[in-house]
Amino acid sequence: MAQCANSSEGTMSEGSLKREVRVVAARAVENHTAYVIEITVGDCKWTIQRRYSEFHDLHEKLVALKKVEKAQLPPKKYLRNQAKSFVEKRRHELEVYLQTLLDESNYLVTPLLHFLEFDIYDIYGVSQALATELFEKADAIVASDDVCEMTPMQLYAITERMKLALPTCAANDVRSDIGHIMDFITRLKLMRIVGSRNKLGSSSRTVDQLPFDLSRFNNLEYLQVDVCTVSLIEGLSELKKTLRYLAVHHTVKSIKEIILPEGDHWTNLEAAGPSNGPPSHVPTWKFISRADFRYNNLNEIDDSIKLLPSLTRLDLSHNNITEINNLQYLSYMTHLDLSHNNISSLEGVHARLGNITSLSLAGNELTSLKGLGKLYSLVQLDVSKNCIEHVLEVNYISNLPCIESLNLKDNPITSIMDYRTKVLDLFQDQYVEMTLDGIKTSQKEIDKVAILKAIQKAKDGKTKKLGMRKDSPMRKRHNLAVNQADIADPTQRKSSLSTKSVCSMNSQYSLTVPGDEASGMDNNNNNCLTHQIQAFRLEI
């Protein structure tokens, strides 16, 4: 994969930075003594614990490599080896032993590297360990469809290692050649950066405060960034040429931070561009079709979103968004997830979501569906876990021609008697194939709704034919039924009567719906649609 440049042995630590090792304490652990070792390289410090037997194993490996004299390690002691004076003397001798190993060469051989955990905390140790791993696995990782996970420490080590004019590997060991890393990152297509708000192990480094550069990842198509500080990430703009999927979690407070690293110039650049599209002087992320900005601290959908003109799917769930803005620029978007935000109104949303087919607004603060009535491409709508109370709110979406799935779970509306039947009755022919709250419409529900629609159709036809006088008995009974429906539903929509209102017009005709056990009537006498329509006609 790479040729090893001329080099000395081992791995050099942090360039010319001072390296110091101290055995700061000795602790009795069960039947042995553990020595606490503190290592400092530049401004990074970490601690480890080792027992004497581990020192002995290290020494044997170094002797085999002819790196130390056999007598250099303090000898074993079989009697009184737990005595305080002896432990203190050995602590000092082990400290001298380790410091001598560090001082003898700028480079650390692999056994010493692992013993002191330079492969976890030191940029040279980390880059060497990564190079060795990639020597064996790089081709398989690049060829697979699995996302390669990397840490900020690994990326920081690569970034810093590239800045130094040093040999590419140690002791002509082709396995640890840094060239393997360079070859790998230029071929990698799928990557997830897994950060943290915590310290890196026992060290003084904070994981999300490590800067790194992504500009060399020039073939990357999928990038997920979790728990990082985006202002410390260099080279993001270089990914515009290849990136197709972008996910950022627990990282930003605004979309602009990740989409427009040159954010300070945004206002002027926007003014220079067309009002209905991305600014002319700002290169767009033209290949990104999917963006996932879940679990951040976003308060708004800012205008930098227009720099993602090819988006088809956008996930903004689990944020603090209160309004749906600036999405009119995403003319290709079909799937939008705004669940678990703070949205309370949908006024005018159709003007911003013209081609949407799937919309999730679950877990917001909605009390009405007003504003969704012109989303003519909408197929799936999830408004579960909101504050929708009245059945007639569904009227706002009942004429959408493509609607197939509606989720109203965990809304007050679901506690209304015959809730499913009343909701399905508001739709036209779509109710037959409708999925409501994740449940497909049953044949029993289809029959119920068909009867309700037939009754309503017959009533509407007779009312039109008779042209009822204001003072006629029929008009009075009709008005009474409408008033009862208004009381049952505070929205006071008088365009249609519920089953309950129609049936209460005259109790002697008992216009019950088959399968409605709440009527208390003998269903065997009410199963025929013809009889029910005849009863309605007799009333007229």
Language-model features, listed with the residues they occupy:
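Short amphipathic alpha-helical molecular recognition features
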Residues: V29, T40-R50, E54, P75-E93, ...
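Conserved beta-strand elements of beta-rich interaction domains across eukaryotes
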Residues: N6, A28, G42-C44, S53-E54, ...
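Phox homology (PX) phosphoinositide-binding domain
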Residues: A2-K163, P167-S176, A450-L452, K457-G467, ...
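Short amphipathic alpha-helical segments embedded in low-complexity Lys/Glu-rich regions
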Residues: S53-E54, A71-A83, L108-I120, L239-K240, ...
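Leucine-rich repeat domain C-terminal region
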Residues: V207-N218, V230-T284, I288, S344, ...
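Amphipathic alpha-helical interaction motifs in eukaryotic regulatory proteins
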Residues: E38, S53-V63, E95-D103, L113-E117, ...
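LRR N-terminal entry segment and analogous cap-like coil->beta motifs
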Residues: F135-L314
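Beta-strand cores of modular interaction/reader domains in eukaryotic scaffold and signaling proteins
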Residues: R22, V36-E38, W46-Q49, H56-D57, ...
